[in-house]
Design a protein with these regions (language model features):
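Conserved Radical SAM active-site core
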Residues: 8-11, 16-28, 40-43, 47-126
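S-adenosyl-L-methionine
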Residues: 34-37
């Protein structure tokens, strides 16, 4: 439980500076998706999202006002108890200034990853950037060249065309993933498998933590 004695003006100032952040939850678990699947990591889910996908599985993260404000010192003190790898996710973490938090994490020799839609300016010091673009609000151009992996959620077959459009914008080193939307996985997986077999630059990303009932 975090108790704050500052007034709203002071809180807003620290939020704008990235010295405090709205945190929906944080937890130590196994990364279930993408290149680092199977790796232990401490997840920090930052509240607030300006994209709002209808199939989002953490819609409760969208409204930052519903979640406690935490200082980055508190966040890092908690994270360093668990792992030398932190994954910052949301919501959409780039709605906030990520420079102070990521700088402090790296001062403690913690590897820092982000999962983002890329809808806002890229801030922060990152060891790995997972870019997961959304049709509702496309990434800003500057982030494409920085992405280490591109993850496209496939809700219907038309998303494959969107995936190809997005793949043209990232660098050659970027790893390309197609991931079925969880509720549509049985319907979409055969389509994705066939597509990847015909277009081998793509890999399949599965939410393995859900298959294995890992939180």
């Amino acid at each position: 439980i975090y108790i704050c004695f500052m007034n709203h003006k002071e809180i807003d100032s620290k939020l704008n500076q990235g010295l405090q952040l709205p945190i929906m939850e944080s937890f130590y678990t196994i990364q279930g998706e993408g290149f680092y699947k199977g790796s232990a990591a401490f997840f920090i889910r930052i509240a607030g999202c300006d994209v709002g996908c209808h199939w989002c599985d953490v819609k409760e993260s969208w409204d930052s006002d519903l979640h406690p404000i935490c200082s980055i010192d508190q966040i890092v003190e908690n994270a360093k108890k668990y792992s030398n790898m932190v994954v910052i996710t949301g919501g959409e973490p780039l709605m906030w200034n990520m420079n102070p938090l990521t700088r402090l994490l790296k001062q403690h020799n913690i590897r820092v990853h982000i999962e983002t839609s890329g809808s806002n300016k890229l801030t922060g010091y990152w060891d790995w950037i997972c870019l997961s673009p959304k049709k509702r609000k496309n990434p800003i151009n500057e982030i494409y060249s920085k992405a280490d992996e591109l993850k496209i959620i496939i809700f219907n077959k038309h998303d494959l065309k969107y995936a190809e459009e997005q793949a043209k914008k990232v660098s050659k080193k970027c790893i390309l993933y197609l991931q079925p939307e969880w509720e549509k996985r049985d319907e979409m997986m055969p389509i994705i498998v066939e597509y990847v077999m015909k277009n081998s630059k793509w890999k399949i990303s599965l939410q393995t933590h859900k298959y294995q009932n890992i939180p």
